[in-house]
UniProtKB/Swiss-Prot annotation:
The keyword Transcription does not apply. InterPro entries: RTX_toxin-activating_protC_bac. The gene is apxIIC. It comes from the Bacteria. It is an enzyme of class 2 (transferase). One of its GO terms (biological process) is toxin metabolic process. Protein-lysine acyltransferase that catalyzes fatty acylation of the protoxin, thereby converting it to the active toxin. Belongs to the RTX toxin acyltransferase family. It catalyses: a fatty acyl-[ACP] + L-lysyl-[protein] = N(6)-(fatty acyl)-L-lysyl-[protein] + holo-[ACP] + H(+). The active site is at H23, D92. The keyword Hydrolase does not apply. Its main location: cytoplasm. This is RTX-II toxin-activating lysine-acyltransferase ApxIIC.
């Protein structure tokens, strides 16, 4: 259940969606489906500068099964999927005012020893996504690469 402050957060995130060239034409129902679970599970980071929201990121902690569904259909996440596993997926990354590097820095601090993945959608190819990998600020490149490879192999097997 959302609390009073959660509605303020929701409004700030909605404002960022409205200012994002990629998100602004997405439906309100998609905003609710992607944002409310993040707020309810405290799985988001909202950067604010001088009282104004400047960037937002949300993540889900998926199981291998929900991850396989998500890769096939990014609209497949259910509320129970958001905090069901240990496989971190970035759901939204919104920085419409050029603060993506700052958001990345904060996320690396938030998850210093973790790795995560995201489906990167390019504005010119809206129907095509690419899985990208992110690593925490204190995890070694060697450990991250080993974990990425393991997760990739497990996902390939799950998708078959």
């Amino acid at each position: 259940m959302m609390l009073k402050n959660d509605f303020n957060v929701l409004g700030q995130i909605a404002w960022l969606w409205a200012n994002s060239p990629m998100h602004r034409n997405w439906s309100v129902s998609l905003l609710m489906k992607n944002v409310i679970p993040a707020i309810e599970n405290d799985q988001y980071l909202l950067l604010v500068d001088d009282g104004f929201p400047i960037a937002y990121c949300s993540w889900a902690k998926l199981t291998l099964e929900s991850e396989a569904r998500y890769v096939k259909d990014t609209n497949s996440l259910k509320i129970d999927d958001w905090n069901a596993g240990d496989r971190i997926w970035i759901i939204d990354w919104i920085a419409p005012f050029g603060d993506s590097s700052l958001l990345y820095k904060h996320m690396r601090q938030r998850f210093p020893y973790d790795i995560g993945r995201a489906i990167r959608i390019y504005p010119s190819k809206k129907d095509t996504g690419k899985i990208i990998y992110l690593k925490g600020g204190k995890i070694t490149k060697k450990v991250a690469e080993k974990t990425f490879l393991q997760y990739e192999q497990e996902l390939i097997t799950a998708l078959q």
